[in-house]
Amino acid sequence: MPQTMKALVKAKSEVGIWMEDVPIPTIKPNEVLIKVHKTSICGTDMHIYKWDPWAQANVPVPMVTGHEYGGEVVEIGSTVRRVQVGQRVSGEGHVVGNVSRNARSGRWHLDPDTKGIGVNLPGAFAEYVRLPEFNVIPLPDDLPMDIAAILDPLGNAVHTALTFDLVGEDILITGAGPIGIMSAAVAAKAGARRIVITDINNWRLNFAKKIVPGIHTVDVTKESLKDAMKSVGIQEGFDVGFEMSGAEPAFEQMIDTMIMGGNIAMLGLPSKPFPLDVGKVVLKALTMRGIYGRQMYDTWYKMLAMIDSGLDLEDIITHRFESQQYQEAFDVMLGGECGKVILNWND
């Protein structure tokens, strides 16, 4: 094995990302080394690329970025027992400390001592990535590597969508990005009655129709959400909301159109704090729950089972590039008219 590898590095405290030669990671006894085959670009990667205030506050420079990937185990540490060389895998990107009350109670996704692959720890936009055995997700032999590369964001969608009962319920999704659209597909498979998704980007709304047959789309710059709700036969309000946008107007519209006693799962992160009309939440007896990442590891089991039973998300991938074409891939992401964008790290 060579001593160095190609990797996309946040090498400077400015806009951009750079392909560099860096040392291949050396694994610890409890870690595995994964040969990366495919990666996908995430919204977090775009924050790092644009070097916005969040990235400046959270990402040390230099840092190998990326955390959505599929690959193959090529080396295991001396204490690794469950994972084998040659196994096809993906990985949970949140590396936890395992000593907090939440972690020791099995709520690992709520461990306050959490570090992110590609954010605080060297990431997967590289030929190789190292990962604790605890975080490794073995994959079925017939799962395409392109799909393996989008399991991380699909997990966010599954965690959000399955927070509340969906069978026979009317669902409102605010934000038609890839995770919002994937959450719609999950809700449809889980038995939701009507699904309405909103955005201000018409391309995204049309894309949602392609991915999720029967979904109702609303461009809130042109159509009232309340009127759209009534036009599809929802009389009293939405039963369950998935807030995926982090946008204040979208959140306000969601609260206004929820049924009395409705449930809201919130994944979208606002770019800055905004006020909340708590009176409406109280008087409508709404239940709201914040969603962070994926439940470790129930979400992974559920999404792999849903894929095995027919959840088809192949078309959510709209662009594929070789790793050397990374700038083209990031430019596509910046353009805003795409689903998931894949980078191929195979020779």
Locate each region found by the language model.
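C-terminal hydrophobic helical "lid"/dimerization subdomain
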Residues: M1-M5, E252-D256, Y297-D347
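Glycine-rich phosphate-binding loop and adjacent beta-alpha segment
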Residues: K210, A247-S309, W345-D347
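Short amphipathic alpha-helix with an adjacent loop that forms part of the alpha/beta core around
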Residues: S224-Q235
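Residues at the starts of beta-strands that form the adenosine-phosphate
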Residues: K6, D170, R193-R194, N263, ...
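Mid-domain Rossmann-like dinucleotide-binding core that forms the NAD(H)/NADP(H) cofactor-binding site
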Residues: L143-K222
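Glycine-rich beta-strand-centered segment in the early N-terminal region that forms part
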Residues: P25-T39, P53-R101, P140-D142
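Short SAM/SAH-binding signature in class I
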Residues: E236-F242
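NAD(P)H dinucleotide-binding glycine-rich loop of Rossmann-like/cofactor-binding domains
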Residues: V95-T174
